[in-house]
Amino acid sequence: MAQKSFYVDACIWLNLFKKEGDPTKGIPYWKIAEDFIETIMFSQDKEIIYSGFVLKELKYKLEESVFKEKVLFFKEEEKIKFVKADEEDYSFARKLESELSYELSFFDCLHIALCKRLNLILITRDDILIQFAKKHIEVQKPEDLLS
């Protein structure tokens, strides 16, 4: 069976790390993120992918000590792999950014470019990103992939 690779957007990691979500409105986002990530971690044929762009977003939103702890977790976990963008990704992201009249951040365009080149499934809750990304790649919310 082929390996399935999921590129998890920073918003999903932030849901988990910051315990985001309102339990009075159903299952909190952090719990859905935790369940999704655990499903991948305990699978035989799935992995999580991240990039420096995800790390930059996390660094901006997390306290320094928490960020360092999470980076260490990423590096030590065998089911979580790091990928680097190349010139092709930057070019495609610039093209996407222009097509969208700069309504989507360059980092989000880079997420799409990486997923396209590496055939990754983008996992996010960002509705604007989902709307545009689905024209180019497979994109899902974590709750849609939990049975």
Residue ranges of predicted features:
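Short, well-structured N-terminal submotif of metal-dependent ribonuclease cores
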Residues: 1-49, 62-69
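Helix-adjacent hinge/juxtasegments
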Residues: 65-72, 80-83
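Acidic, PIN/NYN-like endoribonuclease modules and their adjacent C-terminal/linker elements
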Residues: 1-5, 25, 40, 82, ...
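Residue-level signal for well-ordered alpha-helical positions
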Residues: 19-20, 61, 96, 135-136
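Active-site neighborhoods of divalent-metal-dependent phosphate/nucleic-acid chemistry enzymes
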Residues: 80-125
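Alpha-helix capping/helix-boundary segments
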Residues: 12-13, 54, 89, 111, ...
